[in-house]
Amino acid sequence: MKIAIAQINYTVGDIEANANLIVAAAQRAREDGASLMLTSELALCGYPPEDLLLRDDFYATCQQALLTLAAATAGMTLVVGHPHQEQGKRYNAASVLRDGAVFKTYWKQKLPNYSVFDEERYFEFGQEPCVFNHEGLLLGINICEDVWESLPAQSAKAAGAQCLLVLNASPYHLNKQQTRYEVIRERVRQTGLPVVYANQVGGQDELVFDGASFVMDARGALMLELPAFESAMGCVEWIEGVPQQGALLAPLSQEASVYQALTLGVRDYVNKNGFPGILLGLSGGIDSALTLAIAVDALGPQRVKAVMMPSQYTASMSREDAKAEAEALKVRYVEMAIKPLFDAFQSTLAQEFAGLKEDATEENSRARHACAPAL
């Protein structure tokens, strides 16, 4: 038996497109020999959907898409994250799709309400474990925050689970993956259950989800790792209830990890909002040079335009460096002098500045003048 992890870059609110991505992933998983595929948390609507979760029609659309998805993937078993509404209550849910229908549904038990999370605003707490039989292996379900505490995993174990499937939308920060490994190893130690951990990938507003999904066996050893910061599919074979060794990856350096997170965040922010590209200011300094490199790696040079806005305080070296940076990365480049704006500023404040010696006040006003044409 093979279990597949679908690490997919979803778009919040684009339910039809997300469902199509899941169908395509299920087809690939089937071709790879998998009979079960696990998605990430709230995969059908994308995470975090925020106040879309306050709309009744949103749940109705998700429910219809879930039924359509079940029919489209008949012959595979899928565990899909989605929002669910029942008797006026809302839940962060995961449903088992089997034989073209919804077979079982689990409701998330632990709702994070700190930092970037505010799930208590939207959802009710689930109370019961969910365990189902797949080809002789009893699989329990947890959703993200559930595994950061002990009770949900222990409840699944008590209900007969022999393996834990965990759907996640766990955002990136530096060294986050190591923290995840430590948390999951603690759940493994407490329950003796291997874990299949599927994480969302992609940028959504200020958040970046790094993916880096994995499988850990009952000893706490990694059996499979998926790449970070990109969509991916991974399959692990199970023999007599034990996951077999799959591909492991070399860890990213801290610098590479941060750079890839920034690049992915920029790319998805631009693309998911439908922007044609990026306009950015080049100063000739290292900060804007790095920003330019991230933009080009995210979108390609054809979607980036760089603007140098020199004033009388700008050194010739800065202008030369800015132009060289733009040429090296093959982006469109223009110079837009802001001295006329500075002169207008000086004229407006001439009476207030009368009798005062020119100092850093005037020079530092350059940043304000540069903002005007950018807007």
Which residue ranges define each predicted feature?
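Generic hydrophobic alpha-helical scaffold/packing signal
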Residues: 259, 263-267, 283, 292, ...
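A glycine-rich phosphate-binding loop feature that marks nucleotide/adenosyl-phosphate handling sites
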Residues: 276-288, 341-342
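Nucleotide-activated chemistry modules centered on ATP-dependent adenylation/adenylyltransferase
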Residues: 164-165, 171, 342-355, 364, ...
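Short, contiguous acidic/charged loop-to-helix segments that flank catalytic cores in large enzymes
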Residues: 253-254, 313-314, 361-365
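Short glycine/serine/threonine-rich phosphate/pyrophosphate-binding segments
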Residues: 288-291, 315-317
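Enzyme catalytic cores with a strong preference for nitrogen-chemistry domains
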Residues: 1-281, 292-303, 308, 333
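A conserved beta-strand->alpha-helix junction
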Residues: 228-237, 303-308, 314-361
